[in-house]
């Protein structure tokens, strides 16, 4: 429904090595097998058939007693299926300028992002990083309910995100989606240059799509999205969005996921 409403294209996973999982599929019935796989309905059907043929079935006293030869068991085969796994790494500025209204926008948007990506990937993991001047990994509940009073150093989140990718989500086996939300404030122009270097040289070559959503705040300068647009905006796997309020969420999701990455 989301895809139809926003006219989103289906995602095409990167040409990566897929993880192969094995599943047992029941394919029929056979005469031998473990008791745990006995097919009781077919066993009783075979016993009834035998009793009807031999004339031992009594309709007045319809007792069906299967013999050893009547027993039937499910047959199976192991089927190998490729599974394409993905991870979303959410990052969010939790400094004082990101209030409850901004976090609510991020929460709603992340719900729909999760919903869309789960449609395309059986194995979807989500990780959460919060940052002010220092970044740390947290659980989902902490992600949406933490507020700090310090300044903002965005590079700390990007460094932690890249370390996470290097350690656990190699691009040969994973489709990686980092999403970062902030109000556009950063500690300094020098730190913004560090962010750009991390993105351009280290993160973008390893991910399917990097998305930055700038949530409007009365306290944020809004400069960061401008800097990203000038430096990494032309990259094919970068998507930048400015989110003025809740009414802009749908347009932001379409901007993020409209590339089919």
Which role fits each region the language model picked out?
Residues 1-84:
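Acidic/polar low-complexity segments with low predicted structural confidence
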């Amino acid at each position: 429904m989301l895809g139809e409403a926003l006219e989103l294209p289906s995602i095409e996973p990167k040409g990566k090595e897929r993880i192969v999982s094995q599943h047992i599929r029941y394919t029929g019935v056979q005469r031998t097998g473990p008791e745990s796989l006995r097919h009781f309905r077919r066993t009783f059907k075979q016993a009834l058939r035998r009793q009807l043929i031999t004339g031992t079935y009594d309709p007045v006293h319809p007792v069906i007693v299967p013999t050893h030869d009547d027993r039937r068991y499910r047959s199976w085969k192991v089927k190998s299926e490729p599974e394409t796994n993905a991870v979303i790494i959410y990052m969010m500025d939790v400094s004082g300028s990101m209030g409850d209204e901004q976090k609510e926008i991020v929460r709603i948007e992340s719900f729909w992002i999760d919903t869309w990506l789960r449609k395309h990937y059986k194995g979807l993991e989500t990780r959460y990083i919060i940052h002010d001047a220092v970044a740390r990994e947290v659980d989902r509940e902490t992600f949406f309910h933490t507020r700090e009073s310090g300044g903002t150093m965005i590079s700390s989140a990007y460094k932690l995100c890249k370390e996470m990718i290097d350690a656990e989500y190699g691009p040969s086996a994973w489709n990686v989606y980092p999403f970062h939300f902030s109000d556009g404030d950063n500690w300094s122009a020098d730190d913004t240059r560090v962010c750009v270097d991390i993105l351009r040289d280290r993160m973008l070559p390893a991910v399917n799509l990097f998305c930055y959503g700038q949530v409007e705040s009365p306290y944020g300068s809004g400069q960061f999205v401008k800097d990203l647009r000038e430096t990494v905006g032309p990259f094919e796997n970068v998507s930048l969005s400015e989110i003025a309020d809740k009414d802009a969420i749908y347009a932001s999701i379409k901007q993020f996921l409209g590339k089919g990455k």
